[in-house]
Amino acid sequence: MSEELKYNEPWILQRADPYVYRHTDGNYYFTASIPAYDRIVLRRSETLAGLKDAEEVTVWEKHKEGIMSEHIWAPELHYLDGKWYIYFAGGDKDDIWAIRPYVLECADTDPLTGAWTEKGKMGRADADEFSFEAFSLDATVFENKGKHYYVWAEKVGVGKQISNLYIGEMETPYKLKTVQVLLTSPDYDWERVGFWVNEGPAVIHHDGRIYLTYSASETGAAYCMGMLTADEDSDLLDPKSWTKERYPVLRTDESRGIYGPGHNSFTEDEEGNPVMVYHARTEAEIEGNPLYNPNRHAMLMKIRWDEKKGAPIFSYED
């Protein structure tokens, strides 16, 4: 298996915001943003390497008008409470930047052939007046100590928009139980290139710690990854439980021709070794708006652990 996989080079072309989930039956599932931003696709394979050439199935298409009719972004596939869920963001043809988080549900065994039901916009907690009122996207879900948490990016501010990361405990797969808690804002210069951005959260657990990676800055060569860390026994809804890295944990490497790495997810290979799935570009210069340039490619990276700190090591060295 390891000989078939090539790391830190284009793996699945023109698939941004890549997400890989290994189900309990051993199968791997892949989804991502596609260049047209008009549908949600899934792939399945018995091996991680097999996802590259696996058949791609469209399981949902954007609406012709109204909500969920433009900018279908960053889908993630999760299996919760015996059902499949896809979390994604979408806009409105009449207001393309009215990006909000939405949920699809599938009660069938096979998510590629089963019927998907729209659960609508992600529901906020009853006491929450603010979540998902503004530009909101890039949601992920993770479990800790029997509780499920929802982490997403949302813009705030008038004039200079700032994209922060928020967290909430989930009541159901499509509604929050708690009011939003601010996890991180773009505090540092490397998070403020072009736009002030924290987005694309992803979570990996190791040795009693929770590592939450995220992406920062505009989507060109300046795009990079930061990280937060919390103890799994701490109160994850207390911002003080999280420690933020001062510098990016992964960024452009011109010598390797890897530009703007980010919006990652975590999975494992067939031997159970952790693997990061991320997107990056292979060219430094981009014509036009980087958002609409299709050449963000899904790539793979082996994850190793720092023996002293216990933290993940993000390295382009195979």
State each model region's role.
Residues 1-318:
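Carbohydrate-active catalytic/glycan-binding domains of CAZyme proteins
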